[in-house]
Amino acid sequence: MPSIFTRIINGELPGHFVWKDSEVVAFMTIQPIREGHVLLIPRAEIDHWDHVPEATAQHLMRVAQRITRAIKAAWHPARVGLIVAGFEVPHAHLHLIPAEEMADLSFARAKASSAEELAAAATTLRAALRAQGEAAADW
């Protein structure tokens, strides 16, 4: 059975995408810790982070840096935290989380957001990515 992320990638479930290329996608998480919280995911359904092919892992990190710059431009956080947890969904993924302090990286702070809130955040982030010249934010 495909993971929930694969189902989002395939369009079977809704997702508020901010990045799509041949290897990875990024979309807003439905339970953000803070506004601008993004999930960055390889298209290939791989459970464990350490099983992701090296070239894909390198690409994930390059894209993570680009999205981080856009998050900083859009929301002006002190930092953008990057977390690889891997417990809730058996599909490797990175969390990019705008943060003002270490406590902002606690999943205990996650709260469900409305579709409208997620769409607005995605629109803001795509605009910041486009301002950086990132074509992968357009599809």
In which residue ranges do the predicted regions lie?
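HIT superfamily nucleotide-processing domains
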Residues: 1-139
